[in-house]
């Protein structure tokens, strides 16, 4: 069940959901707007001949921080990692879904490639997978609205929420845009 603005306010007031920093003006009818932080991970395309999800590639990305009040420029065809300004914490019976903002999508900005799902129990900044599919560069201003977080109540609390040792939870407590850790539990079925 998708939570309404009333339910979102109640979950925040009870402390079961935390969003830090929280601005009540970010609550929408069935979501909470989230803002862009000032840190970005750019890909160092010259470091490796290819990307291999089975192998640790520590120099694949480099952290960039915008200067002062300057925007980050995302060029056509570019892909970077960024993160929400807010730290989000969910209880064991609420899951989240991060969606892009319609107004930004209409400019050619994709907020996430595939990883918009947030499991019950997650705590941390949400890493964004930003792509510019437009034909002109897009200015990304730290602090701008970048997406909206929808919250869903699960049919029952998760037996092993995100962060429990059962699943590995590679991104629990992440701070800033976090590079892929796929190599830590890479799975491949022999075919």
UniProtKB/Swiss-Prot annotation:
DCTP binds at residues 101-106, 119, 127-129, 148, 162, 174. Bifunctional enzyme that catalyzes both the deamination of dCTP to dUTP and the hydrolysis of dUTP to dUMP without releasing the toxic dUTP intermediate. The active site is at 129 (proton donor/acceptor). It is an enzyme of class 3 (hydrolase). The gene is dcd. The record marks 116-117 as: Important for bifunctional activity. SUPFAM superfamilies: dUTPase-like. GO terms for biological process: dUMP biosynthetic process; dUTP biosynthetic process; nucleobase-containing small molecule interconversion. Pathway: Pyrimidine metabolism; dUMP biosynthesis; dUMP from dCTP: step 1/1. It holds the Pfam family DCD. Gene3D superfamilies: 2.70.40.10. Keywords: Hydrolase, Nucleotide metabolism, Nucleotide-binding. Residues 163-191 are annotated as: Disordered. This is dCTP deaminase, dUMP-forming. HAMAP family: dCTP_deaminase (MF_00146). Belongs to the dCTP deaminase family. It catalyses: dCTP + 2 H2O = dUMP + NH4(+) + diphosphate. Residues 171-191 have a biased composition (Polar residues). It comes from Acidothermus cellulolyticus (strain ATCC 43068 / DSM 8971 / 11B). CDD domains: trimeric_dUTPase (cd07557). Its EC number is 3.5.4.30. Homotrimer. One of its GO terms (molecular function) is dCTP deaminase activity.
